[in-house]
C-alpha cells in the first residue's frame, strides 16, 4: 500500500527474507531504492504505473544492489550512488558526492554520507518527507558496524537525528522485534519504547510491517539514536552483537 507524505508517494517493497526496498514518487517521476531482487522490483514499478527514473543505492552489499542493473535496463532508469564507493557498486550513471542532489519530478533528492555499517554507506533525503537510510538506522536499532568506526557511526546517526521529526525513515530490513528485545534490555523504564515494542508485536503477529517509522518515534525509543557519545554507542553496539 502506498503512503502519501509531504508531496511524495512511498511504496514499501518486501524482498528476500526480511529486506525492504522503497519506491518513491513525486511529480510524475519515481526512484527505486536498493533493489535486491530485479523481478520483485520490476513488478512493483509496473504496478505503480510503469515509470522509473532513478535507481538509488545506499551501499554495496548484495542484498541491496543485486537487481539494480536489470531493473534500470527494464525501464531506462539511471543508477545513482556514492562516487567514493563506485568500485563496489554496479555501474553508476550519476556518481554523487555527499551533498549532491538528483531531480525527482522537480524536487531535489539529496545524498548524505552515513558511514558506519560500511564506509561508503549513504542516505537519500526526499525533501523533508522521507530518508532512505538503508542499513544505517533500523526501527529501534541500527546496522552492524562492518567497516566503520564508532565515531563515524555515531556521527551518522546524529545526522539522521537532526532531520525533521516528521521524516519517515525508510529502513532496509524488518528487524523491529529483535531490536525491541535488546532495546528493552538496556532501557527497561522507557515508556515510549515499551509502547513501541507492544505495537511491533501486534503488527508482526498480524503479518503487518512495522516500517516506515517516524523519526520522532525513533528519537523517543531507539537506544542507538539516543546515545550521547561515540563511546556510549560503541558499548551498545558491542552489547547488541552479543545479545
UniProtKB/Swiss-Prot annotation:
Question: Could you tell me the EC number(s) of this protein?
Answer: 3.1.2.6
For binding Zn(2+) 1, which residues are annotated in this chain's numbering? 59, 61, 117, 135
Q: What top-level class of enzyme does the UniProt entry assign?
A: hydrolase
What does the record give as the function of this protein? Thiolesterase that catalyzes the hydrolysis of S-D-lactoyl-glutathione to form glutathione and D-lactic acid.
Could you say which protein family the record assigns here? Belongs to the metallo-beta-lactamase superfamily. Glyoxalase II family.
Subunit note: Monomer.
Q: What is this protein called?
A: Hydroxyacylglutathione hydrolase
Amino acid at each position: 500500500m502506498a503512503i502519501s507524505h509531504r508531496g511524495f508517494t512511498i511504496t514499501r517493497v518486501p524482498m528476500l527474507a526480511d529486506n525492504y526496498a522503497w519506491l518513491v514518487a513525486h511529480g510524475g517521476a519515481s526512484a527505486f531504492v536498493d533493489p535486491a531482487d530485479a523481478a520483485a522490483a520490476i513488478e512493483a514499478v509496473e504496478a505503480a504505473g510503469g515509470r522509473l527514473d532513478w535507481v538509488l543505492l545506499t551501499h554495496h552489499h548484495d542484498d541491496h544492489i543485486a537487481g539494480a542493473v536489470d531493473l534500470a535496463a527494464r525501464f531506462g532508469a539511471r543508477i545513482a550512488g556514492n562516487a567514493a564507493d563506485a568500485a563496489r557498486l554496479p555501474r553508476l550513471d550519476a556518481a554523487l558526492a555527499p551533498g549532491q542532489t538528483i531531480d525527482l519530478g522537480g524536487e531535489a533528492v539529496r545524498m548524505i554520507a552515513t558511514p558506519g555499517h560500511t564506509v561508503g554507506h549513504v542516505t537519500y533525503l526526499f525533501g523533508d518527507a522521507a530518508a532512505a537510510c538503508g542499513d544505517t538506522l533500523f526501527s529501534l536499532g541500527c546496522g552492524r558496524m562492518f567497516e566503520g568506526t564508532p565515531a563515524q557511526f555515531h556521527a551518522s546517526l546524529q545526522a539522521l537525528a537532526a532531520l525533521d521529526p516528521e521524516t519517515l525513515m525508510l529502513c532496509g530490513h524488518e528487524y523491529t522485534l529483535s531490536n525491541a528485545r535488546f532495546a528493552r534490555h538496556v532501557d527497561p523504564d522507557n515508556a515510549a519504547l515499551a509502547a513501541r515494542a507492544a505495537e511491533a508485536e501486534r503488527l508482526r503477529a498480524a503479518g503487518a510491517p512495522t516500517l516506515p517509522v517516524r523519526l520522532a518515534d525513533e528519537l523517543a525509543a531507539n537506544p542507538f539514536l539516543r546515545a550521547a557519545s561515540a563511546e556510549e554507542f560503541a558499548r551498545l553496539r558491542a552489547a547488541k552483537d552479543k545479545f
